[in-house]
Design a protein with these regions (language model features):
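Short beta-strand-centered segments at strand-helix junctions
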Residues: 32-80, 85-132, 137-168
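Short, low-complexity, charged amphipathic interaction modules
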Residues: 1-27
């Protein structure tokens, strides 16, 4: 049994929603599909810089990947040739700040970003992020996310899949 201390009502609701979604998906061979080509993952340090020390991101909506959520908070992304306004932050916080954009977004702001797997930020271009507490220039982290599917280990096992497998989606 899991024991949670100091958990907010929003976090509890998020955990319950994710548990119900996981149970429903166990009963189905269908996998829900969502597309999210424009979002930001932040480190704890970068949340502090952009929103103020100790600020806690606010969960807005649970995502299909357990423990992941879209936040109420958004940032502006500033590149050499333009900017993207109100880009959603995804939580929870990460070990490295990462900005996932569509190829069109990159072209519009003047960035040449590579197609990469999530987390593979080494050698990628950087941008400036603007939040309510000021701006922050991140030296790397902009990428076009490679196509992928988020599944729980139980879902993957039900389909006979392992991490890194290639699939066709119909």
């Amino acid at each position: 049994a899991l024991v949670y201390h100091d958990i907010s009502q929003e976090q509890l609701l998020l955990l319950i929603t994710q548990a119900v979604q996981a149970e429903l998906q166990k009963r189905s061979r269908q996998v829900p599909v969502g597309i999210s080509v424009r979002h930001i993952h932040l480190t704890r340090d970068d949340v502090d810089k952009l929103f103020g020390y100790g600020y806690q991101l606010t969960p807005k909506k649970a995502l299909s990947q357990p423990g992941q959520f879209a936040c109420e908070e958004c940032l502006d992304i500033i590149g050499p040739k333009g900017e993207l306004k109100h880009v959603r932050i995804l939580g929870p916080e990460r070990s490295a700040t990462q900005i996932e954009l569509a190829q069109t977004d990159c072209r519009n702001i003047g960035i040449k970003a590579p197609v990469r797997s999530s987390g593979d930020t080494k050698g990628t271009p950087g941008v400036t992020l603007r939040g309510p507490n000021g701006t922050l220039t991140v030296p790397e982290g902009v990428m076009i996310a490679d196509r992928h599917i988020h599944m729980t280990p139980a879902q993957a096992a039900a389909f006979g899949l392992a991490d890194g497998d290639r699939v066709q989606v119909k």
